[in-house]
Amino acid sequence: VTEPDAGLDTGRLKTFAKKINNGYLVNGQKIWTSTAKIADKILLLARTIPIEECKKNTDGLTLFYTNLDREKIEVREISKMGRAAVDSNQIFIDNLEVPEFDRIGEEGKGFKYILDSLNPERILIAAEALGIGKNALSRAVKYANDRVVFNRPIGKNQSIQHPLAENW
């Protein structure tokens, strides 16, 4: 969903799917696309109606589930410090032909459809972040108890105890 110039403002997406004979011709780019390095398919939200012709900026977006054609989609991995189990990528779409059959639901209603998955995904990501934070805190406590300086664990010092206790 995310694009470099739109961020979380889904209504500002610029990737465009132009209607052609039996489908659509898609051009644009996305960022933070998970598993694009290994995926065979892509879930793609693209504008099919120019934003100027829409009542709301979230109108005119259409959802597709189609083949990730590497002849038409360039995938560049984004380096990350964490969450390395899943690759994150920037993708560049150049004249990708998408059959009409690969459209999900009605044309122009894609934002409504994508919301059904975005809200649960946000909860999942929040739960993941809480788990990562809890694990980091547990490791910090273990380190404070294991690290010995001047013959005593650094966890005996109030300057170490207070931030750990505040975050427990």
Label the model's feature ranges.
Residues 27-76:
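A short core secondary-structure module
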Residues 15-18:
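A structural signal for short hydrophobic beta-strand segments in well-ordered beta-sheet cores
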Residues 7-11:
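Histidine/acidic-residue-rich, glycine-tolerant segments that coordinate divalent metal ions
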Residues 21-25, 41, 88:
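A generic structural signal for beta-strand entry/edge sites
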Residues 1, 25-27, 66, 105:
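General beta-strand structural signal in soluble alpha/beta enzymes
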Residues 73-168:
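Glycine-rich beta->alpha junctions and the first turn(s) of the following alpha-helix
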Residues 4-6, 31-37, 83, 120-124:
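Glycine-rich phosphate/pyrophosphate-binding beta-alpha loops
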